[in-house]
Structures are given as C-alpha cells and as structure tokens.
C-alpha cells in the first residue's frame, strides 16, 4: 500500500515537473542573472525596462501560438508587418499630421487586411503557410522601404508615445511608492486565487479531469506570489506601465479564447489531426483564415507599440521579430507538430527570452554570443518536446 502511494506521488511529481519545467527554468535563469549582474536584473527600473523591451515579443508570440496550433505552422511575415505598420503610422501621424486615434484605427485595419490576404492564399488556394508568409515577409519589407523612402520618421507626438512609454498615475500621495500599483497587484492575485478555486470546484462537481493536486497547489501559491512581487517592484519605481495594460488584455482575452471557446477547441482539433477535424464537421479553411488574419492584426498592434517605444518609424524596425515570437512559443511549450500549447506557456517563454537577452546584455556578453545561446536554447526546447512525445508514444 505504501509502495503504491509512493509510486503515485513520484508519478505525480514527475508529471508536474514536466508541465512546469519552463517555469522552473525561468526562475533558475532569473536567480542566475540576479547573482551574476550583482542584483541589477530585478531592480525596479530594469523590471520596467524588461516590460517595455519585450512587449512586442509577447504580443507576437500570442498570435504565433494560434498559427502553430493549426499544425506546427508559422508566420514568417510578422517582423515585416510590424515594420510596415510602424512606417504607415509614421506617414499618417508625422508626415500627414492626421489625428492619432484615427491613424491607429487605420493601422489596425491595415493589419487585418494583411492577415486576410495571407489567410486567403493559405486557406482557400491551399498554398503552404511557409511559402505565403515568406512572400509576405519580402513584400511588406519592400513596402516599408517604399513608404519611408529609406528615411527614419520622428518624432511622434506625446499622445501617441504614451501608449508604450507612459505610466498610470497614482491616486494616493505616498512618497516613493505607487500604492495604486500595489493595490492592483493584490486585487489581481486575489481574483486569480478565487477563479482557480471555483474552477476546480466546478470540475470536481462535473467529474472532469482536475489534474494533479500538487500542480494545483504550486499554481495557486506561486503565480499570486509572482504577481505580488512584480507589483511591489513596479510600485517602487513609477507604477504600472501603460503597455502592461495592453499586454494583460491580450493575454487574458486569448487565454479565454483558447481555453473556453469553440473556436479555441477547433484550433487544437485542427492541430491534433486535420483530416479528422474536417470529417467531424469543422470548417478547417475558416480556422486557417482566422488564425492568420488574427496574426497580422496582433502584428499591427505590436508595430504600433514598438514604434511608440522607438519614438520613430525606422526602415529596420521589425527585423528578426518573427524569430523571437517563434522562439517564445516553442520555449513556452508549444509543440512543433501543432495541437499543443497555451497562452500562459507562451508568456513564460517570452519572459524567459527577455530575461535571457537582458541578463546577457548587463553581464556584457556580445550580440554574437547572445545569438548562439538563444539558438541553443531554442534547439533544446524543441528537442525536449520531441523526446517527450516519443516517450509518450
């Protein structure tokens, strides 16, 4: 009896270690760089900088996840779309002096149209996504250069820059501490705990699979603790960055879509077995079309955010961004074969890459070695996925 319980505990621990391996790796990397940077990595100002620097990666990675879920497909055009939308925003706002909010709406609409263009060729003409998005990468890079004519446009007005470089004000006059930020963190942590408890009660009543209890306890303690630590750290600087609100909305909305909606289930079904999904009545063409339309929409959001952070529209903006997004997805647990991956995992993957980049920069590691390290990390992450599936089979 005792042997059986020990075996069950070992099995449960092993499953949870596999499930939370990237979270454990992220914590380990943060501790390593916190020590090697002489406790500079997690100072309040640098944490704010990490959020500003990696906002575009998180936005793009969430969209890329939906493409990967459809069967391991990727979108190579997102970096060029980011650059093109930034150039379009610069042309409208700086050159043509158009209203900032109208310009933002036009840029987002342009992103949707670009996604529909890609989605049409992929879903209805059935050209492989790799080819379509490769042509998109070249096409929109060229359009960026044409729009900017090789020049960098600046500066953007303050009303636009605040979207990516501003902070929310404090409602309380506490010196050197943003109490509003701390209260928001406490409320977010409490809401998370309540939602997790009610979700587990609902699953138990319906006799659904609840997962391992150890994992549940770890999640309900660790994630609120992380939220509170981040809130406290930001409160010691300038408070909540405005871009953090954009990220929170995107992450929460897409986590809900992928976990709680029919559209989300269709994505996982398509990635699991496209033929079976089609035979079961799922409109696979529509799923592909919407996944790639959504990807370019989020690329437009990332383009607006990045242009605001850069405070200019530059011809080189967006270069290599698709690799950061793809890397964040695979490091965060998305399967190279499709059908597996979560928004939470992608968020961890994006933060992991951000901490890795920032930590190596502070330590003084050159950009050449940084690329080598990131390449090896991505390779090992995908290899871990492949080996895990082989063992399961």
Enumerate the predicted regions with their spans.
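Loop-to-transmembrane alpha-helix initiation sites
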Residues: 53, 129, 158, 176-186, ...
């Amino acid at each position: 009896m005792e042997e059986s319980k020990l075996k069950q505990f070992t099995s449960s621990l092993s499953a949870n270690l596999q499930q939370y391996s990237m979270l454990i790796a992220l914590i380990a990397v943060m501790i390593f760089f916190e020590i090697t940077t002489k406790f500079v990595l997690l100072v309040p100002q640098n944490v704010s900088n990490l959020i500003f620097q990696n906002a575009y990666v998180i936005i793009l990675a969430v969209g890329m996840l939906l493409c990967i879920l459809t069967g391991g497909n990727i979108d190579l055009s997102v970096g060029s779309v980011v650059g093109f939308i930034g150039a379009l925003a610069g042309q409208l706002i700086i050159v043509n002096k158009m209203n900032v909010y109208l310009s933002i709406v036009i840029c987002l609409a342009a992103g949707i149209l670009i996604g529909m263009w890609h989605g049409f060729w992929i879903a209805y003409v059935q050209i492989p996504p790799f080819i379509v998005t490769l042509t998109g990468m070249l096409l929109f890079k060229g359009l960026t250069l044409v729009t900017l004519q090789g020049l960098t446009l600046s500066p953007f007005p303050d009303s636009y820059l605040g979207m990516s470089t501003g902070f929310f004000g404090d409602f309380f006059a506490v010196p050197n501490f943003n109490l509003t930020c701390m209260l928001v963190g406490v409320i977010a942590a409490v809401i998370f705990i309540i939602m997790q408890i009610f979700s587990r009660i609902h699953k138990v009543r319906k006799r659904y699979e609840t997962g391992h209890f150890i994992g549940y306890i770890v999640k309900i303690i660790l994630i609120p603790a992380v939220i509170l630590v981040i809130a406290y750290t930001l409160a010691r600087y300038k408070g909540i960055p405005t871009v953090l609100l954009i990220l929170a909305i995107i992450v929460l909305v897409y986590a809900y879509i992928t976990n709680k909606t029919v559209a989300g289930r269709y994505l996982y079904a398509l990635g699991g077995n496209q033929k079976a999904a089609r035979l079961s009545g799922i409109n696979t063409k529509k799923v592909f079309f919407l996944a790639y339309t959504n990807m370019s929409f989020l690329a437009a959001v990332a383009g607006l955010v990045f242009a605001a952070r850069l405070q200019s529209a530059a011809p080189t903006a967006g270069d290599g961004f698709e690799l950061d997004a793809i890397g964040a997805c695979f490091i965060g647990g998305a399967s190279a074969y499709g059908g597996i991956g979560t928004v939470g995992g992608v968020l961890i993957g994006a933060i992991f890459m951000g901490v890795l980049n920032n930590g190596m920069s502070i330590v003084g590691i050159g950009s050449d070695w940084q690329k080598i390290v990131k390449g090896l990390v991505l390779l090992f992450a995908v290899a871990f996925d492949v080996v895990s599936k082989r063992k399961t089979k």
